[in-house]
């Protein structure tokens, strides 16, 4: 007589040779990942910079849409928006109030996310909607990751230290110190500080995006950076910086002798820096009074820059110099993004 086989034993016996089913990501997986990232990222330099997680979410979102899983893609988009600090619930609200969001640290990412929301929540049957979706995801991936830096610095991925040594020798080309995409250590920062002190009179721009910087590492560089007399732009995007650093930067900017000619500091795509405080923006504007594209909440809430006039003015450039899409809320009056 044969032995009685239970469902459990059959499952165990069949599992090694069973063909795996389609892989489906659980929505709660991304939610728990964001919670863990919020607790740990940026503390004492632990973990990877958040752009790794965000790029992974964009790629997974595109995969879901290709498979026709729009509901799951919408849920994942909510998690991505949460990770990027976009708390608005209505797509119309985002579009109509875009001018008031101009103090966002990374308007380009937010504009791409809004476009993604349109394709996911309000799909249009005509035209190549999937092609447009793929293009948006490529643009967002490119913007959130250091691909452009790898192209600028040949051999960066293979020999980052050799690349750093070459960049810190001689005078800065085009008056720019471009170290973007090169992972930096505390010891490297000492070499960078010495270089800035030696060649600081020539430096107009410093690029430190995607270098793995933490708050403490930026504070280590701050004395050298803040005394560069010709510095106009400072890029700190794609690192592990937190809101705590904004207090130090804002306090430094209150001193007119520090960062005397800086017009913009790029803090996008970091851990939890989603908007810039008004004292920070006002200090920048005092240094560049002729630049009218550094608005504050006070200006947008009073005087001639309110209501329809504020919306009509949103076709000027945003603080990082790229065109801002005008509000087009009338195109999506039925669309609401769930949170």
Curated annotation (Swiss-Prot):
LRR repeat residue intervals: 203-216, 228-241
Residues with PTM Phosphothreonine: 325
Comp. bias regions, Low complexity: 11-21
Ranges annotated as biased composition (Polar residues): 330-339
Domain of life: Eukaryota
Gene3D superfamilies cross-referenced by the UniProt entry: Ribonuclease Inhibitor
Alphabetical UniProt keywords: Leucine-rich repeat, Phosphoprotein, Repeat
Coiled-coil annotated residue ranges, if any: none
Entry keyword NAD: no
InterPro entries found in the cross-reference section: LRR_dom_sf (IPR032675)
Location of Phosphoserine modifications: 322
Segments for region (Disordered): 1-25, 294-339
Family designation: Belongs to the LRRC75 family.
PANTHER family recorded: LEUCINE RICH REPEAT CONTAINING 75A (PTHR39654:SF3), LEUCINE-RICH REPEAT-CONTAINING PROTEIN 75A-LIKE ISOFORM X1 (PTHR39654)
Name the UniProt record assigns to this protein: Leucine-rich repeat-containing protein 75A
Gene transcribed to yield this protein: Lrrc75a
